[in-house]
């Protein structure tokens, strides 16, 4: 009987130890979560983070060549994902802004978290990039795909290199708009505000955007 009681006590002590470790682990996890709050979205006027991207199937003659964002005044960053239904719903409306962006001396950069088949690029000649490690999505605090980010050049700058397979430095560019094309992913509403179009229209007058951030609709 004494031997049986001692064994039971040892088992009970082990169970109590495991339970105590579980409680401590839960407390540490809660404390860690509380100490690292979720980052807020980028806001109008903030400096644009650099982009760490890989080009989509760059020709060999371009892999080590330099290109420059010399004449562009506006950049539209499209963070998309072909696996997300909302991306395909919004895609025609984003592509439809290509001429408007060009009128503003702008460029569209299409950024995906995955490789892309050539038949899935938005249009011939589109500047498509891969963010395989999620560095650019993290830097721009992207929570849902698709998300559109409009950047504006603050002033004339020296020749800042736009390099294949390297970081795109955007030191003199600032955030002007972050959000969706509009608040109607399915495109069925009549008379709904065209948020991205209005932001681009504002930028033809100044750097001020009346509504610089909107809710995004898509996949986390």
Q: Which stretches of residues belong to each language-model region?
A:
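Bacterial N-terminal signal peptides that target proteins for export
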Residues: 3-16
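Bacterial N-terminal signal peptides
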Residues: 13-26
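N-terminal "domain-start" segment that seeds a small globular fold
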Residues: 33-67
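Short, internal strand/loop/helix patches
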Residues: 52, 123-164, 170-171, 175-176
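Short active-site neighborhood of thiol/selenol oxidoreductases, capturing the structured segment around
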Residues: 65-88, 200
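Loop/turn elements at helix/coil->beta-strand transitions in domains of secreted/extracellular proteins
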Residues: 72-75, 104-107, 126, 145-146
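Thiol-/selenol-based redox modules, centered on thioredoxin-like
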Residues: 164-220
